[in-house]
Amino acid sequence: MVELHDLQPHWGATKEKKRVGRGIGSGHGKTAGRGHKGQKSRSGDRKMPPYFEGGQTPLYMRIPKRGFKNPTRKEYTPVNVGVIDKLFEDGMEITPEVLASKGLCDEKDRVKILGDGELTKKFVIKAHAFSKSAKEKIEKAGGKWEIIS
């Protein structure tokens, strides 16, 4: 019966580790199969980042810089009046918190009301910004808009 301690890999299933740099007689002595000189013969070979181009000025430096990031930019989450008309009851006061409760924005987001869609109900809408068409539609429906900071 075969015991665990008797088990061995099948002949040819394993390979001896190549021991390089162990003398001329081994066939892998002196330069250890790496050839003479150059980057590929040195230790640390092939550890260059993918953007390294061998000392040539890399692409990211050859291409000109464009534009800038405005550090004071204010980003708004857009909400259309048509969506407000569908989701809310007539006469409600709409604030960013109310919009967040319906999943239209996050509570911390700045909200901009846009004028896409029809507005048939009367609302008091408080938001951080309004488009011109949204203001007109809110007033036309008999509602009010108010900018909050």
Swiss-Prot record:
List this protein's GO terms for biological process: translation
Q: Which InterPro entries match?
A: Ribosomal_uL15 (IPR030878), Ribosomal_uL15/eL18 (IPR021131), Ribosomal_uL15/eL18_sf (IPR036227), Ribosomal_uL15_bac-type (IPR005749), Ribosomal_uL15_CS (IPR001196)
Q: Fetch the SUPFAM superfamilies from UniProt.
A: Ribosomal proteins L15p and L18e
Comp. bias (Basic residues): 31-40
The record's disulfide annotation reads none
Does the keyword field hold RNA-binding? yes
Q: Which family does it belong to?
A: Belongs to the universal ribosomal protein uL15 family.
User: Known PANTHER family for this protein?
Assistant: 50S RIBOSOMAL PROTEIN L15 (PTHR12934), LARGE RIBOSOMAL SUBUNIT PROTEIN UL15M (PTHR12934:SF11)
What this chain does, per the record? Answer: Binds to the 23S rRNA.
Relate the assembly described in the record. Part of the 50S ribosomal subunit.
The name on file for this protein is Large ribosomal subunit protein uL15
